[in-house]
Every structure is written in C-alpha cells, then in structure tokens.
C-alpha cells in the first residue's frame, strides 16, 4: 500500500534516482461495487507530486535484484514437466525463458499443452508423475488449489510442484505439496496504475477499475489500486466493478465492453477505464467507443501484449501499459526449481521490476513482437547466468 508516508518516501527516492541519472547523462457491476473518495490523509498537491515522481521512476529500466548465488550442478540431467495452456504469447514467453534457463544448466523441459482444458491439465499431471518428472510446473495461472489432489500425488511421489502468478510474493497459496508459486507483485502493479491515473489527471481522475475475481492476481491489483486512490487522491473518484470470465452467460469480451459502456453512461465524468490486464482493455475499449467517449476516456492495464503496445504507438484511447519482463519471470521460476534440487532456500520474492509504457516511450521500439531486451533495455537472463549461477563471465 502506498499510504501518504510511503508515497512521500518513494517520491523522494525517485527524485534522487532521477537526479543521479541526469548527472550520469551529463557525463460486470457487482453489488459490492463501491466508490472510493474518502479517508485520504494526503493533500491533493502532495499526492500528485509524489505520483508524478513514481511514474517518472517507473518509466525507466527496472533494476535487477540478484538472489543469492548457488551451485546449479545438481540440475544436470534433470527433466521438468510444464503443464498448461501455451497458446497465449505471454505464456509461451515464460515457457521459452525457463527452457533456455534450464538448458543452460543441463536440464530438459517437456511441455504438455492443455489448451486451457481442466481435464487435459489432470492428464498432463498424471503423465508427468508416471514419467517420474524431477519437477512439475503449473504454468498458466490456474491456482494450484484447483488441482490439490494432483499436487498431493506429486508430493507423495517425491516430485516438487511449482505454480505461476496465482499468489503474491511472500503470501504463498496454502496447498499441500506446493513448493512455491512464483509471481509478480500484483499489488505493486495496482499501485503503479493508480499513480499513473493520479499523475495524468493532476489528482482529479474519475473512472472505473474492472477486476475478474476468478483470477486472483486481478484482485491483488485492485487492492493495490484502491488503497492508493483512497489514501492519496482526495479528489479522485473510482468505482470498482467485476466481470466473470464467462460474463454471466455472455462472452467475456461482451461483459467487459458492457461494464465500460454503462460506467461511462451512468457517470459522464468518467475519464479512466482501468482493467487488471491489458488484454481486457482491448474489449473495454469497444465499450468506450460505443459510449461515444473515445476522445476523452483513457484506458490502461498490465502485461504489455503486442496488440496493446501497437495501440500505444499508434495513439488510441489505450494510453498506458505496465510491463513486467517475461524473461525475468521465466528465469525466476527456473532458478527456484534448481534451488529446490540443490537443497537451497527458495526465493519467495524475486523482486521482478516493472516499467510503464506510454505513447511517448514506445515510438523507437519494435512492437511487432515482444523483445524484452529491447523493450526493457536489459537481458535479465544474463544476470542469472552470470551473477547467480556463475555460468558466464
């Protein structure tokens, strides 16, 4: 939570970092939906100044925080089974980053594509256990608790089980047999979305935040966003609404468009539609346009999928995307699996950084495909290979 004192501290840190950089350069509606506008302990001007400093810092390259170095030789000859839907481009990037990391250490990755089917997930776990995998990864954001029986079977077979992006760093899901859920800090994502809305509107943002409760990370984002708005923007007004993955009988795309459209029509002062994920903003954007508000309502989300990065570059109602390096996440997962094999303490919080992308800072980027090294300015995998595993000099 970015409460008033934390906002001020972070803003001061951001200002110092920016000054140092400059010197270097010189060298569906839910009944529980609520409007947040009270309880602020921060003046409007100080909240805006702090938010602008946070946005400026978060628009730079995320700094890598190296976990403790260790000997990865125990990975040689091991096999990991990855169970999950790999049709989504971002999920494929996680797979390929982890594959690259394990291959560098002599381990092999086998992928079982479930295409999003629950029965296929179960079949994949059964095959991995029967195949005596050295580790199993639930790699598409489904919560491990949904497959608690399979996780327990893996534990009984002596196979460590990992999941991705269903918890919060240092707030692990309670599932018997789950070694670790490796995740972004989604509350921090929400905080950054809020800081951007505050800074962009000079502390007068009005709008709606849309979450999908079936996806735990979207709720974490909403929590971070709401706390910042309530604590640090006395003149901001946001509603918090929910859509189910099925949209209550309609498609998810129709549900998202409907929430955006009805929010604007019910409150003509709406100027921001924030979705937990940028893929959802693609559909919410159609609702904005249906409401005739494409020229005044701004959208933002998380994930930096290629279509939204292209929308940023072209100049559309989608105005900001929070990105978390996918290579970093894939390597952080691979690192923890190898720590498990080596008997090392696992790293619950890999401290994966974020970067804010806008129309201004994407103009020189190739947005036809995601390239983390270009987009973030760093090859995060090289840090692991060199500084953590000692494979490169």
What are these regions (language model features)?
Residues 39-97, 101, 110-122, 127, ...:
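Extracytoplasmic "Venus flytrap"
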Residues 121, 180-207, 220, 253-257, ...:
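Hydrophobic alpha-helical segments within soluble ligand-binding/sensing domains
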Residues 44, 144-145, 150-188, 206, ...:
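Flexible loop/hinge segments that line or gate small-molecule binding clefts
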Residues 132-141, 160-165, 208-209, 267-277, ...:
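Periplasmic-binding protein-like
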Residues 25-36:
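Bacterial lipoprotein signal-peptidase II cleavage site
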Residues 141-156, 225, 245-311:
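Hydrophobic alpha-helical
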Residues 37-78, 232, 325, 329-393:
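Hinge/cleft segment of the Venus flytrap/periplasmic-binding protein
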Residues 80, 84, 98, 189-242, ...:
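An alpha-beta-alpha
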């Amino acid at each position: 939570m970015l409460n008033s004192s934390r906002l001020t501290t972070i803003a001061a840190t951001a200002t110092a970092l920016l000054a140092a950089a400059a010197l270097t350069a010189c060298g569906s509606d839910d009944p529980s939906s609520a409007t947040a506008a009270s309880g602020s302990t921060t003046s409007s001007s100080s909240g805006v100044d702090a938010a602008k400093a946070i946005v400026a810092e978060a628009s730079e390259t995320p700094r890598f925080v190296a976990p403790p170095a260790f000997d990865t030789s125990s990975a040689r000859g091991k096999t990991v089974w990855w169970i999950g839907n790999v049709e989504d481009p971002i999920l494929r990037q996680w797979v390929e980053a982890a594959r690259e990391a394990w291959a560098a250490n002599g381990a092999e990755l086998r992928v079982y594509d479930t295409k999003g089917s629950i029965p296929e997930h179960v079949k994949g776990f059964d095959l991995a256990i029967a195949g005596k995998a050295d580790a199993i990864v639930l790699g598409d954001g489904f919560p491990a608790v949904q497959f608690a029986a399979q996780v327990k079977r893996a534990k009984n077979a002596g196979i460590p089980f990992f999941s991705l992006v269903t918890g919060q760093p240092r707030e692990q899901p309670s599932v018997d047999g789950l070694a670790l859920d490796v995740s972004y800090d989604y509350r921090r994502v929400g905080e950054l979305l809020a800081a951007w809305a505050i800074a962009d509107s000079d502390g007068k943002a009005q709008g709606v935040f849309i979450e999908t409760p079936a996806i735990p990370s979207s709720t974490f984002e909403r929590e971070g966003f709401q706390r910042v708005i309530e604590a640090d923007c006395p003149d901001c007004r946001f509603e918090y609404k929910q859509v189910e993955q099925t949209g209550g009988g309609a498609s998810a795309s129709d549900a998202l468009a409907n929430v955006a459209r009805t929010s604007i029509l019910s409150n003509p002062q709406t100027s921001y539609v924030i979705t937990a994920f940028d893929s959802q903003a693609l559909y919410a954007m159609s609702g904005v346009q249906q409401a005739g508000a494409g020229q005044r309502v701004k959208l933002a989300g998380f994930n930096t999928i290629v279509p939204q990065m292209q929308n940023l570059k072209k100049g559309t109602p989608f105005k900001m995307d929070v990105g978390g390096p996918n290579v970093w996440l894939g390597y952080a997962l691979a690192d923890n699996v190898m720590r498990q094999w080596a008997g090392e303490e696992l790293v619950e919080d890999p401290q994966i950084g974020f970067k804010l992308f806008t129309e201004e800072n994407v103009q020189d980027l190739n947005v036809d495909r995601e390239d983390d090294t270009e987009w973030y300015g760093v090859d995060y995998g090289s840090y692991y290979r060199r500084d953590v595993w000692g494979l490169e000099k």
